[in-house]
Amino acid sequence: GLQQLFEYGYFHADPHPGNMFALKGGSRKYGHLAYVDFGMMDTITDSDRFTLIKAIVHLINKEYLLMAKDFQKLGFLTKEQDLDLLVEPLKDVLGGAFGSEVGNFNLKNVTDKFSKLMYSYPFRVPSRFALIIRAVVSQEGLALRLDPQFKILKIAYPYIAKKLLTDNSDEIVDILLEVVFDNQGRIQIDKLESLLSTLFKDTENINSDLIPVA
């Protein structure tokens, strides 16, 4: 799912268990997934892809004002919105989602909290993101059924870290420079170390016995 969104910009928008098969072989340790039923497919623009990557990095670094700017660019907030007013609400919703560590993040719980937040603050869901949210939440739900200890950011952030450190495209390099250097051009060693440690940490903690073969 991450590759579909962040690499190809073309994704399966209805990834329920009947539309995915776990197959042996391939380049992956635990085999690979085969998708069927392509009646509900969608695309994501390059601009949205890169902004989502930035939003994930800002989420990990708990930079809520920058994340509010990402939401604004993606269309979840109007251009007239005072973003400073949203820092604390975002911190309450997203900061509490982590618990003691990044891996405690649960997208379904955060989505539910955001739904309540929309009654008090001018968040809106652009129509082009409806299928993206559906697809990601569906896949997280399936993963949680297979492994109740599954944590989506333990999969997503290492993927993003690897992309930032190995992708030579101008857009990704710009994001990396924004992460590693502050506004005065000084290198932020802690953030660079975080990216590197995440990249080299072994995150393959999925039990192969839990992968169904249909």
What do the PLM-derived regions correspond to, one by one?
Residues G1-A214:
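Conserved catalytic cores of large enzyme domains
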